[in-house]
Each structure stands twice: as C-alpha cells, then as structure tokens.
C-alpha cells in the first residue's frame, strides 16, 4: 500500500504512520496532497458556541482523529501545553479562546477548513467574521447549560449570514447532563426545527456510546483515545426509545422536505439513503437542524460528527455567494460568484481577519471565485491599490504552510497587504465588484488608558495602531474635554485583555481607568430651524441660509444619523449640500446635555438661500453648525443608554437575592426557568448599572452564581438618571456648582 493510499484510505493509526513517513520523505506536511480537491471534497466549517461549551476541546479531538496532530492536549490541562488552537499565551492562561484560529485537515479524502471561534460575548466580532466566510457551522451546546445567551447570539449571526448548521450536544459525561432538555430548548428558544439523529447510551459517568438513528446501529468508541469504532446492535433496553425517536426524526424531516414528505404520506418504506438525502437538503436550506450527541473530553461521538459534516453540510459549490457591482446613483447590481475551481473567472476574495505576525501583517482571506497564484497582482476594491502576491500560506493555528496557488472555496492568508477587515480583492479593478461587508457592532464601554512609563509611549502607539486595525470594535481616541486618552470596546473583559496584551507583547504596562458608558443624545420630537450665516469683513464674505427640520428616527434606528436633501430648485446649490451634511455630522460628535454623540436623528434640508459671490461650502457648513445650536436651544432632548441582555444562573436558594439585586439595578426581568436545583433568570439591565455586578453576585451566591451579558439596544434613560448625567457633565465643564450635601452625623 503506497503512502498516499494509506493516508486516504487507512485507519488513523496507519494515517499517523504515513504522515511521519511523508515528513521523512521531504513533504512539508499533508498540505501537498490536500491542496487541490474537487469542490465536492471541500468543507468550510466553523465551530461556534457559548463560552465553556467545549468548542476548543472538540476541535482538538477533530485534529487528532484526522491525523493532523500526533497527541492531544487539554484547554486547562496538567501538562501546561494548552490546546493547539489556543496559540496566544493569554488564551492558554485563561482557558478561553480570544481570536478565531484557522486550520485545515483531511477526513475521508475531504479537505475540511475549520475556524475555531471565541464563545465570550466580548469577542463577538471574531464570530461575525468567521461566519461570514463559512459555508456551514457546528453549533456546540453544553448538555448541562443548554441554550445560553451567547448561543442565542451565535444563532442570530448564523441567521444573518444564512449559515447551515449541525448541533452537537457536548459534555454528556458531566453531572446533571440532560440532552433531551437541550433539544426542547433549541425548539422553544431558538425556533429550530430540530430532532436527534443520535441518542446517548447512558449519560454522566455511565456514558458508553451512541445510537445512530439513521443507520439503526449502536456505536462504541474503544481502544486508546476512542480511536477504534465498533458497530453493534442497539441495546435491548433502548430499542423502543430508538424507534420512537427515529419516527420523530422522520416526521420533522417530512414537514421540511417535500420528497420525504410524499414518501411519508404515501406510507412507502424509507431507505437509509432517503433519510440521508433529506437531511442534507433540509440542513443546507436551514429548514431542519440535525442534533448529534457526544463528549469530546471522553473521546465519544467525534468521528460520527465528522461524518455528518461531510454528509449534511454544504460544499462551497452549494452555497450562493453574491458580489455587488457599484454604479453611481443606482442600487448596486447583484452578481452570483462562480464557485468552480477552474480559474476561468477573475479572482474575488474577502479579507475577514487581520493579524500582526512575526513577518508583518497577516491577512486571512476566503477565495470566492477564480484562482490566485504566487506572483499575481490583485487590487483592493475599496482603495484601488495594487498588491503583488509574494507568498501564499495556509494556516494551522499559528503555524504556516506555503502553497503556490489557491482556488475558489479555499481559506488562506497573505503577508504584507495593507487593508482592513471586510475588504474585497479582485484581479480586475475596473469591474467595481465588492462583497457585502462584515457587520460590526458599535462599542458600548470606554475606559481611560495611559502607559505607566513615559518611555513606553512608542510601544504604546504601535500596540494601539495594530489592535485598532485588527479589531474594528476596538476604538481609540483622545478626549479634549478631560484631556484623557480613551479606548472603547464591547465590554470590560475586551479592554482588559488588550491592556494585558500590550504589557505581554509590547512590554508596555498600562493603567485602565474606570469604565464609562457610551451614552447617546437624541431629540424627543421634531424641531424646525431657519438659520442665516452672514459674515462681511472686507473682500468676499460668507453667506448661507438653510431651512429645514430635525426629527427623531424610530426607536429601532436610534443608533443612526440620517441626512436627507429635500431641496427643490437652486436656492441651495447642489455643490454646497455636502457642506451642510459635513457640518451636521461634525456637530453630532458632541451633544449639549452631556457631551455625548447625537444619534437617532434625521436632518431634513428643505430650503435656503445663497449669494452669487459670498456663498461657499464652508459657509454652508458653518450655517449647519449654527442651525444645530439653534435646535439645541429650542428642541426637547433626551439621553439614551445601552441596555444589556443579562442571563444569571445560580442555585435555587439564591433566587430571591438575585432577583432583588437585578431590580435594584433598574433591571426588567423578562423570564425565568428552573431545573434540578438551579435557576436561570433573564433580564434587561442598563449597562451603567451593571458595573461591579460580578463581585456582588459572587458574594450573594457563595461564589456559585455566574452571569453573561450582551448588548441589546439603546433606550431612553430614566429622568433622575438623566438629571444626574447632565449635572455631572456641567460640573466637569465648570458650568454648575457641585452639590454640597450635608453630612449625616
């Protein structure tokens, strides 16, 4: 048996031996023979879930069983090696995944590109980017925790990018695991048409194997690390349940799939292939979610999950990817990109992640159309800059393997390309083609930051420049009012991790100030303006008059700013309208009540006046400044604050204390549920009231409670909160005397 044959057909022990022999034979890795598969033999998948559901451990097992790594390490293992996919030192220390690591592997002659994504809410943008470029995903759920807040976030993101998914209920070996409850939560909370395609043979410490409902066989994982798979008859005590669950699976599938539905109604017999074909069709259409079970830590259920990835998730040719051709004054024209791996069409790729590596900036891309070879020239669609490809690499966590060419469907990386995440690259700069950009949420928390030593300022600047380029949710700016340098992001943990990375990677220890909330200011009702800007001081003067109305946008758009030109005729010449918009957007950076940005406002320019000599774009910009100051005085304003979705889980005996604390923090409780001595409460709480909650929860639940929160929306503040914010702002500006309250004896 040749080495290559042994690799493609042999079991994993043979495969590992073959890999070692190939290494001696001078191959860099199995990149050389997994490089160019036909499109049917490629899968681009992501592994997404709530924090601590076991994503990274599952990826580690997948890499081991597919022969990609020779030994396994745990996320917080005793050997201190850490998981392969957690390449950053900070990730291994904390046992969480911060960046989404990319790798690829081979299973049954199919090339699988895997992106392991973070589960912590503060790193949502990493998940967004990963899902944008994937064709399918594995949603990992904890058999104890079930559907948690971040699971719902990931589910929403999958819906946004239309990503088909398999569900894998992990951690069957944990005390209190209940996969049946998790399935009912998937149906009720996530609205998934879901059913088991596998059942566990025992749970907790009694977890022996799984039942495959499609093949009607029991699967046992034996030998060292569960590498030997033994098929057997379904245990006697599980046959009735297996038949019932198989019938339930067929009913759910028949509701979602026409072909199987007809067979079901005509009461014709089903074959295993009929069910598999229906599962594939419905999974790709997102009308059904197959649910698999297992425990990655105890090496059970991982190989059948890999088989399901090949059987039910789409290849790049089965997913429609659209490009948009921009045309002036028209809606962009949609173009379906050709996924064929033949290089006939021009190359189109999307940069979905940036990383500063040892050799300069590393840019992760997904190729959607055509072929890219070493030495080719490509153009950035946003900047029109030309880039020559000196080196193409494929990634295995933080190790690189050089390749000569990549085709549609491949995930790869380039060096030294100056771009931002979400940029489109093409070989033809004239076609104005771009992919839809990646959705980036607005930051909600800001903190003052300063280096501890003045000599570290250079390193501090380098770190800030790198991190803001890599992560679009991490912002950096200087506040002139308080003369402080501020960073803003998706949460306290997000900013703390960057502070620690500055110290570790750049030798620049920094001090973070207290967290500050990103409030917004908006109008309560419409306010008209008619403003004349006139300045004459010898020579040509300035003259501009604008008339219109500023009005609030609907609540679901209260983070946006809109500008509408409703002028008719030439009272306001069209070349001066951009000046009005520029003036409006400049003034929107700082409100009157609390100095925060304006949002949720539409500026309607309806009429005005100009002077044949004295009018200019600058004059109209200054007129917009004056008009908005007029609206500040005459309009009715309110402050908006970010509201967070909070999920708290704790033992039942602390339910009263937890609910009381949330109510005290102005929380609105939206739901509760209890199970086996534990309860979960869902609430909407203003972010401003959530600081310090972690410590309070720990002390009130004897350290047993835990909570997660994620941004939901902006909503008006309570009147007393607004008064307090306005007063604090006025005091900081020296506009009001601080309250001198009498001290109580």
UniProtKB/Swiss-Prot annotation:
Its main location: mitochondrion. It is found in: Mitochondrion. Belongs to the TRAFAC class translation factor GTPase superfamily. Classic translation factor GTPase family. EF-G/EF-2 subfamily. Keywords: Elongation factor, GTP-binding, Mitochondrion, Nucleotide-binding, Protein biosynthesis. Pathway: Protein biosynthesis; polypeptide chain elongation. One of its GO terms (cellular component) is nucleus. Disulfide bonds: none annotated. One of its GO terms (biological process) is mitochondrial translational elongation. Disruption phenotype: Larvae are able to survive on maternal contribution until the third larval stage but they fail to initiate the rapid growth phase and die. This is Elongation factor G, mitochondrial. The gene is mEFG1. The keyword GTP-binding applies. Mitochondrial GTPase that catalyzes the GTP-dependent ribosomal translocation step during translation elongation. During this step, the ribosome changes from the pre-translocational (PRE) to the post-translocational (POST) state as the newly formed A-site-bound peptidyl-tRNA and P-site-bound deacylated tRNA move to the P and E sites, respectively. Catalyzes the coordinated movement of the two tRNA molecules, the mRNA and conformational changes in the ribosome. One of its GO terms (molecular function) is GTP binding. GTP binds at residues 49-56, 116-120, 170-173. SMART domains: EFG_C, EFG_IV. It comes from Drosophila melanogaster. Residues 40-317 form the tr-type G domain. This protein may be expected to contain an N-terminal transit peptide but none has been predicted.
